[in-house]
């Protein structure tokens, strides 16, 4: 038989020893912390209900938990949607309508957490509009995204109207509000921190809002691969967000200041605007958000929003609600 030369034999033994060392070393799993992993890229926009995100960043809750998070902030939902679909974002804070709109292009996207229900901070401002029927023939500014279409549809239907009865001007929420304030449009679909202020500036009023409804839900979305590969990090992430939301729900002055600074308003203004959003913590996600037995469950909102997506021809066929979300992270918290 062939016998290895002494130097080569020692080389082979060294390689084998190295392989055994690597094989025996503890390997990271999706259920163990991954502090050495790349940062989670988390993005939100200028909706008041997303204030838990800047507070978690500003208070250092992610850092305290040993989680690296890159914080991105967008001035419009449309820009944020584009970035998420381009795989530039891991975790996105969106309306459920935005989420479903993206799922039509990427079915691997799933809703994994309920952030809030709009409770009056989304709405429509109008000038000389006394009833829904008065909207006929008017020029209305709204962004070409599903949740704003749903809000406008809910109002127009009360007057037996559709978008075919009005002129639509496609503008992001901030720009729509500015156009109304400048009296360039008759009505605008927008949200706080623009809704109330722009109504006054434009000589109008809030003629319709989401108060006492779950018409607009805000959620966190991620792709299947991230949910499976970084489950431990996602649990850490939402525990940090939970701490921030609890501060906001108790009107903590420092938290309100951090959130207000992000949106360009004072802490007192932030406190007032947050009255128009019902923020959910982990417990709320468990008992209401993903609880099919709750009358205010997110699942009811998804059913309505999925139907609207089909009606507006955003998706080619009706979507099954159970395919839109993954509640495994919430259940594990």
Protein language model regions, located:
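Short, low-complexity disordered leader/linker segments with a strong preference
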Residues: 1-39, 333
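Solvent-exposed, acidic/flexible segments
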Residues: 46, 73-77, 117, 145-149, ...
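Solvent-exposed, polar/charged alpha-helical surfaces in well-ordered, non-transmembrane soluble domains
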Residues: 51-55, 59-60, 82-86, 100, ...
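Short linear loop/turn motifs
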Residues: 70, 78, 272-280, 320-332
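Pocket-lining segment of extracytoplasmic ligand-binding domains
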Residues: 90, 97-98, 168-169, 175-264
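Secondary-structure end/capping motifs
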Residues: 229-314
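Conserved C-terminal helix/tail region of periplasmic/extracytoplasmic solute-binding proteins
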Residues: 302-333
């Amino acid at each position: 038989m062939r016998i290895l030369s002494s130097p080569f034999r020692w080389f082979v033994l060294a390689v084998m020893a190295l392989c055994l060392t690597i094989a025996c070393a503890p390997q990271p799993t999706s259920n163990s912390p991954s502090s050495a992993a790349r940062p989670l890229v988390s993005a939100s926009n200028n909706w008041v209900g997303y204030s838990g995100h800047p507070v978690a960043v500003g208070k250092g809750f992610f850092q305290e938990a040993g989680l690296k998070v890159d914080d991105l902030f967008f001035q419009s939902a449309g820009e944020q949607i584009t970035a998420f679909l381009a795989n530039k974002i891991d975790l996105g804070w969106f309306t459920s309508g935005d989420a479903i709109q993206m799922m039509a292009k990427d079915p691997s996207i799933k809703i994994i957490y309920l952030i809030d229900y709009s409770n009056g901070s989304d709405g429509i401002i109008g000038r000389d509009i006394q009833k829904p029927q008065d909207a006929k023939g008017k020029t209305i500014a709204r962004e070409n995204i599903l949740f704003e279409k749903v809000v406008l549809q809910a109002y127009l239907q009360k007057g037996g109207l559709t978008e075919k009865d009005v002129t639509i001007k496609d503008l992001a929420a901030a720009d729509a509000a500015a156009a109304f304030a400048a009296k360039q449009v008759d009505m605008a679909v927008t949200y706080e921190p623009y809704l109330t202020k722009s109504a006054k500036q434009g000589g109008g009023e809030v003629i319709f809002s989401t108060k006492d409804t779950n018409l607009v839900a805000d959620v966190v979305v991620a792709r299947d691969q991230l949910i499976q590969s970084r489950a431990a990090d996602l649990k850490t992430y939402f525990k940090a967000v939970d701490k921030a939301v609890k501060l906001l729900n108790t009107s903590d002055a420092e938290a309100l200041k951090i959130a207000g600074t992000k949106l360009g308003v004072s802490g007192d203004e932030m406190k007032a605007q947050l009255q128009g959003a019902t923020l959910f913590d982990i417990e709320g996600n468990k008992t209401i958000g993903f609880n099919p037995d709750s009358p205010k469950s997110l699942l009811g909102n998804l059913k309505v929003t999925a139907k609207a997506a089909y009606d507006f021809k955003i998706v080619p066929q009706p979507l099954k609600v159970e395919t839109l979300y993954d509640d495994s992270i919430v259940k594990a918290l």
